[in-house]
Regions:
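Phosphate/dinucleotide-binding and metal-coordinating scaffold of catalytic cores
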Residues: 1-230
Length: 230
């Protein structure tokens, strides 16, 4: 892959275009139709104006922060880098723009990127205990036998703790040094917050044979009504 330009979408609507500059920063310009009645996806950095926005520094890997937020954090980046190496691609040579193409439509948040770069075959959620064991093996620098499944389900996720994502849910697994009760504890914290009147997403504790259960939170970044959740 040698991607130098990506289109940014919100649902099926074109927001604008990203393009790599000669000094490896990533510029952005709003689409004409978006300028007519759209909103600023980053009000302070990217106001609604007909211009090319170029980051002033290499902060956020040369991306504007709103797009850098689409990139996976520690766990997701580990999965992406393993998949790249498995395909003979040095991770350090993959640009931030190409990493956004890998995210495609599978990342957290409402923004998606086209054309997407598919690294994997479709996978299904399957047995959560087996997936958790695969995550632990990867964290311990061991070989994960089903890296494709882990990448498909978690390669675009944020945060440091191992997790997988479905269309509607984010499911967290215990990290290698965490207590097996961490899922139940997080569920109880969220229930407590809800009892205090704090608005929280729907949560569940999914059953496990190995621990007290896996914490799951319903995603709000894919709801049609949440048109401005970036």
């Amino acid at each position: 892959m040698n991607e130098r330009k990506l289109d940014v979408y919100l649902g099926e609507r074109l927001v604008g275009t990203l393009a790599e500059t000669v000094d490896h920063r990533v510029a952005f310009a709003y689409a004409d139709a978006w300028l007519e009645d759209g909103f600023a996806i980053s009000p302070f950095s990217l106001p609604i104006e007909q211009k090319v926005f170029v980051p002033g520094s290499q902060a956020f890997q040369g991306l504007w922060g709103v797009f850098a937020d689409s990139l996976p954090d520690a766990w997701g980046r580990l999965l992406v880098d393993r998949m790249l190496k498995q395909r003979g691609l040095p991770p350090e040579e993959v640009t931030p723009l190409e990493r956004l193409a890998i995210v495609g439509s599978s990342g957290m948040g409402a923004l998606t990127y086209r054309p997407a770069w598919d690294l994997h075959e479709p996978s299904h959620l399957g047995d959560l205990d087996a997936l958790s064991a695969q995550c632990q093996a990867l964290l311990l620098q061991e070989d994960a036998s089903d890296l494709d499944a882990l990448f498909q389900l978690g390669g675009s996720s944020g945060g440091a703790r191992p997790k997988v994502m479905t269309e509607e849910w984010v499911i967290k697994f215990p990290a290698s040094r965490e207590m097996p009760e961490v899922g139940r504890m997080e569920k109880e914290y969220m229930d407590c917050a809800a009892s205090c009147g704090i608005e929280v997403p729907e949560t569940r504790l999914l059953p496990s044979r190995l621990c007290s259960g896996y914490f799951a939170a319903r995603r709000f970044d894919r709801e049609q009504a949440a048109s401005q959740v970036i």
